[in-house]
Regions:
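Conserved helicase NTPase catalytic core signature
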Residues: 1-39, 257-399
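Core RecA-like ATPase module of SF1/SF2 helicases and allied nucleic-acid translocases
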Residues: 538-687
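Short beta-strand-loop-alpha-helix junction that forms the active-site gateway
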Residues: 768-805, 822-827
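Phosphate/oxyanion-binding active-site loops and adjacent basic polyanion-contact surfaces
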Residues: 40-43, 63, 67, 94, ...
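Charged C-terminal transducer/switch regions of large nucleotide-driven machines
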Residues: 109, 116-315
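Helicase C-terminal subdomain and adjacent C-terminal extension
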Residues: 442-499, 628, 661-758, 829-832, ...
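Helicase-core coupling region on the C-terminal RecA-like lobe
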Residues: 497-579, 647-649, 677-735
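ASCE P-loop NTPase helicase motor core
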Residues: 21-135, 249, 360-519
Length: 851
């Protein structure tokens, strides 16, 4: 039974949906992931493993979290694993983005884009013709040799990187062990000095116990001393001479072994002896581990590992890296090898001719001539807009190994079921916290008609006895539900737990924080999005401007009601548009035009309004104020949140179309999904232009409040200090961190007090960074992390994976990180403020910031 049939059966007959296809082995997926030039987050990897393990998967992609990137990676991996994949979306821009990413890595022949767009269709015909021409040429020995050389070089690089990873894993475990031992030693030292008032020089003279047997023997002696002393208490001080001699012998032996003065024992008794013994053993173990760790070439190995990582998975220019070159060449050679078979050549030729035709009769005639199995052997990746795909594809069950449905919250059941009919596995990608089916386009049926049709065709025809009302509850009605609604519905037995993509790359921190706090973060500290743009140079920038206009909405005049338009908002929108187009700043736009990421750049601009009347007014009147070229220069877009889902711009203007009389519009304007989309479209800056807000517009006021607090918190020099960051001594977890802070503060005071700033426990990318040094002049920043601290775990590969995930996450966000060699800051178990490591840190800071 097909996956679609099993899905429908589970809904209509109340049966639990179970995956029927064998999961792809984890080892194969792991190997394939290493062979594509993407650096994937934990969440992205999890979503990929789920998609290859289950027949139905839901990937939730909040705004700006790399949904298209994940789909592209999943698509390329499926191809490498020998699978045929279809990517379909309700919106063409979503398909275009995935096509661009895939073709950049695989080459134009790496995927087949099926569409009615004439320009795209002509480009596809040209591609097919080029392949037909290329097929006349034999595969040269040079091409084969290049392929073999690239393959061997990649295998060598991957093997070498794995070897370094294993060594880093071992080093990290030992560094972590030293860190934990040393922290325990520091606690003993602090306790002995502060509670027992033992002087530091006494502690430094204590003999180190170098084995467990010696420690246990001395502890036995101490316990025997306790028993003798207890017995003396019980007998009111009457102790035999033998016991006195024994006590004296035991105490003397312990003191001699520890090199401790007898006066300390007289003051504190056996308890202090036990503490000294345990401390002595811990400091000995720490020193032994430190001596081992000091021999590790950690910096060299990390540098080599990073170099290999940059060769294989560069952060920029992916299409020109070695893995992409190999993917392009292997794709090209694979197609050319198949085209040596005349039947494949004929298939390609037939399909090219078929692209010429649009009439149903001709399409049907030419489709019959095409061997689609061979076509999809040539092009295992197919992409297209939902409504245009069907004429190009045979209506054959489980034609594709994997179907990925993007923007799934906007895909109604009537359109998607024929697509899913062709799938063995399908992956639903979307976000139930953004706009749903009503934003997706045409609703096919009148709701009354749909209810009557359901009663006629389905009631009493299924084991679950689903009425029209219960069908609506289960999200089975075309007019109200999407495929995403269906699989998430808890009344159905197919509920799919989403894998949430949680790294946000789109918006400036101030804007992304609002989206995260308002829509994605819960009381759980681990919930919400990692704001990957939260770098110092971005945190110091204001990205929001509130502008209130005094005009009422036109329809507020009861005697002569007009459209749902606030003319003051519209007028201010045009003023800002004019300033951005001409790059002539005014009081409203001076900040945005001088924003470092936008200064002297071509800025794209969008205007979103909750009221269709207002967005239509702006769209219709904009050409009266601006030329076609001027609007094109800012890639101008205006619409409602429904229009904007899936789109973004450098600068967004939110002009809701509101005044103080609009209290009854709150449910519409402040709807969770609608407001989420409207407020998350801007990459760099948002203008909020509005009439007087009704008292009940709480979400708009929350946005103003959060943005206002952010701006208010900027209490240092304007545009210089990262918002919300600070330096608190109470955030230092240990004496060592206090020492590091001392040294950095000394360096700043001596070298660059007017430029450099120190922060600690800085929240960024879902982590807390130990220290961050920020240069107000150059906007450079450096994260300083303590090796061995809580960033490590003790269990094998998870230990390295977590550490490497942290490093790779910060790398993806653009952080430069310096790891402190914790083990070099101690001498014989004591912090050494004069160690070479201190000077090493200061030299590094000077080279990084001042040279």
């Amino acid at each position: 039974m097909t996956t679609l049939n099993r899905l429908l059966e589970s809904v209509f007959e109340g049966k639990r949906f179970e995956s029927a296809h064998d999961p792809i082995p984890t080892e194969k997926i792991d190997k394939a992931i290493k062979q594509i030039p993407f650096t994937l987050s934990d969440a992205q990897k999890s979503s990929i493993f789920q998609a290859f393990s289950n027949d139905i998967t839901y990937i939730q992609g909040p705004p700006g979290t790399g949904k298209s990137y994940t789909i592209s990676a999943l698509t390329i991996l499926a191809s490498k694993l020998g699978m045929k994949t279809l990517v379909a979306s309700q919106k063409k821009p979503a398909v275009e983005i995935v096509y661009s990413k895939v073709s950049n890595l695989l080459g134009e022949e790496g995927c087949l884009f099926l569409t009615d767009d004439q320009n795209r269709k002509e480009a596809t015909k040209d591609l097919l013709q080029n392949l037909l021409t290329l097929a006349r040429q034999e595969i040269s020995n040079k091409d084969l040799s290049n392929y073999q050389k690239l393959e061997k070089k990649i295998d060598d690089l991957l093997e070498e990187r794995d070897r370094y990873a294993e060594r880093i894993n071992y080093y990290n475990k030992e560094i972590n062990a030293f860190f934990n031992l040393n922290e325990e030693t520091q606690r003993y030292q602090d306790n002995l000095k502060e509670v027992n008032e033992i002087k530091e020089e006494v502690l430094k003279k204590i003999t180190k116990i170098d084995n467990e047997e010696a420690r246990d023997r001395l502890l036995k002696y101490v316990e025997e001393c306790r028993k003798i002393r207890r017995k003396s208490f019980e007998t009111e001080g009457k102790v035999s001479a033998a016991q006195v001699l024994r006590l004296n012998f035991l105490v003397t032996t312990v003191l001699k072994n520890l090199n401790i003065d007898k006066e300390i024992y007289k003051n504190y008794g056996e308890e202090i002896l036990e503490t000294f013994i345990r401390y002595s053993r811990e400091i000995s173990k720490g020193i032994n581990k430190q001596n081992l760790v000091k021999k590790f070439p950690v910096d060299t190995i990390r540098t080599s590992f990073d170099d290999l990582t940059n060769q294989l998975y560069p952060s920029r220019d992916l299409e020109n890296c070695i893995l992409s070159k190999f993917l392009k060449l292997s794709t090209n050679l694979s197609i050319r090898k198949l085209l040596e078979d005349k039947s494949y050549l004929n298939t390609l030729s037939d399909f090219r001719r078929r692209l010429h035709w649009r009439t149903p009769k001709k399409v049907k005639e030419f489709n019959k001539k095409i061997d689609f199995k061979k076509l999809f052997d040539l092009f295992p990746i197919v992409l297209g807009e939902m409504r245009t795909l069907h004429p190009y594809l045979p209506f054959k069950e489980e034609l594709f190994d994997l179907v990925i449905v993007d923007e799934a919250s906007q895909v109604n059941l009537a359109e998607v079921i024929p697509i899913l009919f062709r799938a063995k596995r399908f992956c639903i990608v979307g976000d139930h916290k953004q706009l749903g089916i009503k934003a997706g386009g045409v609703i096919f049926l009148n709701k009354v008609t749909e209810r009557l049709n359901w009663q006629k065709r389905f009631e009493d025809q299924n084991q679950a006895n689903l009425t029209a009302a219960s069908a609506k509850e289960r999200d089975l009605l075309v007019s109200t539900s999407s495929i995403l609604d269906l699989i998430r519905n808890e009344n159905n037995t197919i509920t799919s737990v989403p894998i949430v993509l949680n790294e946000h790359f789109r918006s400036m921190p101030m804007l992304a924080d609002f989206t995260n706090n308002e829509f994605y973060k819960s009381d759980n500290e681990q919930s919400g999005l990692k704001i990957m743009t939260a770098l110092p140079q971005n945190k110091c920038l204001n990205s929001f401007k509130n502008i209130e206009v005094k005009t009422p909405r036109e329809d507020s005049d009861e005697d002569n009601p007009g459209d749902k338009v606030n003319p003051g908002e519209v007028k201010k929108v045009y003023s800002i548009m004019k300033s951005i187009i001409t790059k002539k700043s005014n009081a409203d736009t001076e900040e945005v035009l001088n924003l470092p990421p936008l200064k002297d750049k071509q800025i794209t601009l969008g205007v979103v309004s909750f009221m269709r009347d207002q967005s239509d007014r702006i769209r219709e009147e904009a050409p009266l104020s601006f030329s076609k070229d001027e609007l094109k220069s800012i890639d101008f877009m205006v619409g409602t949140p429904e229009d904007f889902q899936g789109n973004e711009r450098d600068v967004m203007i939110i002009a809701p179309g509101v005044d103080e009389t609009c209290s009854r519009s709150r449910g519409f304007m402040e709807n969770d999904q609608r407001f989420n989309v409207a407020s998350s479209r801007a990459k760099f800056y948002t203008f909020f232009i509005h009439g007087k807000l009704p008292n009940n517009m709480m979400r708009m006021k929350t946005m103003l409040n959060q943005m206002g607090i952010e701006v208010k918190d900027k209490k240092y020099q304007d545009g210089i200090t990262p918002l919300g960051w600070n330096f608190l001594r109470s955030n230092c977890d240990s004496n060592f961190e206090h020492l590091v802070a001392d040294q950095i503060e000394d360096f700043i005071a001596e070298k660059a007090s007017d430029r450099l700033m120190l922060f600690n426990q800085v929240e960024s990318c879902g982590y807390f960074l130990d220290f961050v040094v920020y240069d107000q002049l150059t906007k450079k920043s450096l994260a300083i992390e303590v090796d061995g601290k809580e960033h490590f775990y003790s269990d094998g590969f998870t230990h390295t994976d977590r550490h490497q995930e942290r490093i790779m996450t910060l790398r993806r966000a653009g952080w430069k990180t310096h790891h402190l060699d914790y083990w070099n800051w101690f001498e014989d178990g004591w912090i050494d403020s004069e160690s070479s490591a201190v000077q090493k840190l200061k030299i590094y800071l000077e080279n990084f910031f001042l040279k």
